Amino acid sequence: VRGYADAGAAGVMIEDQKWPKKCGHTKGKDVVDLDEAKSRIKAAVDARNYGDNDILIMARTDAIATRGLDDAINRMKIFSEIGADILFIEAVKSKDDMKRIIKEVPGHHMINLIEDGDTPLLEINELEQIGYKIAVMPLTLMSASVKIMQECLKNMKNRVYNTNVSKFSELRDIVGFNEYYEIEDKYK
């Protein structure tokens, strides 16, 4: 944590999953016992508090999947008491569970939204009303990219030109070709 803070990172996420790490919305994951989880968070908080670091500590638990909501809430209460700045229970199953988490565990909460995942996709304003301060959608762009790639490959297989793609001129602008050209012209 001190290394990340020294490098300028704004925050780190410390989680309680057993190794090997798995996606929170997939099967086969488990969490370490509470004592080890507490030690992980405590070590991160102590590292943050050493010197002049202001890095944020996000505590994550995947306990809801294998030990239930009560255990996940208990862990978050403890992580908050230890000094975690942001609280993240992964793969929350319902809106009612979200409300319960916010009600029972004071602090700044994050929610992870994955299309077709375990957590319901609520509107951002609804998540704000429930009490979430951060919402992430970590797979949205990758999922959209895969879908359009599949469509393009299907079209190529069927010998059809793809029309649902960026124009080459737009792509050049996005990746910075025009800047490269300007630099090239400047130093000819």
Task: Put a short name on every predicted segment.
Residues 1-139, 143-154, 183-188:
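Alpha/beta enzyme core
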Residues 158-188:
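Flexible C-terminal active-site loop/helix
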